[in-house]
Amino acid sequence: MTLLISSLFGDRPYVVVLGIAQDGGAPHAGCEKRCCIELWESGKEEKVSSIGIVNPLTKQSWLFDATPDFPSQYRILTENHNTELVGIFLTHAHMGHYTGLLHLGREVMGKKNVPVYVMSRMKRFLETNGPWSQLVSMKNINLKLIENNKYIKIGEQLFVEPFLVPHRDEYSETVGYRIIGNEKSLAFIPDID
């Protein structure tokens, strides 16, 4: 499902909703509830929660969370919207939010220096735990340290503001993002307690 907010045919940045489900997608593995059974039987699925920001003028895009559905979400963002992925913002270290980074490594895409925006605990987690640390050491990803409530400029009149949110923080802090444009803004908070 792709939902576009703002003008699809204009020059203004817009949001692409790439997924709405929890960490394991829908249907979840092993789920025997009616909602899952209906999805299994129909062949339909919901991708894990993620959004993309597209700047049609520069043909650049940014991904918010690298989910287990990264291959199809990357394709939607780059091919369907004719952009180059120039950055990934991670929210936290639970399986549905960062495991897609593996596709950037040498076994799949072999990318070089993809900017990945993270707060300090998430940065340390990725640097000190394999296989993520290999992505760092081989320079597939370039970790960009961000701070609570400090704006990051990603385009002309386009900013991202990270902010801490309460959640289970076993391995990293949990971050929400406010994406601020010239006329509109939105918040991306895939998990919160």
Task: Describe each model-derived feature in a short phrase.
Residues 1-6:
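Bacterial N-terminal signal peptides
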Residues 8-77, 143-193:
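Core dinuclear metal-dependent hydrolase active-site scaffold
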Residues 24, 94-100, 125, 168:
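Active-site environment of divalent metal-dependent phosphoester hydrolases
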Residues 30-33, 77-80, 102-106, 130-133, ...:
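Short, glycine/charged-enriched secondary-structure capping and boundary segments
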Residues 54-117:
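Active-site metal-binding motif and surrounding structural segment of the metallo-beta-lactamase
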Residues 83, 96, 139, 156-158:
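Structured loop/turn residues at beta-strand edges in well-structured enzyme cores
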Residues 121-131:
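A short, active-site helix/loop in glycosyltransferases that binds the activated sugar's phosphate group
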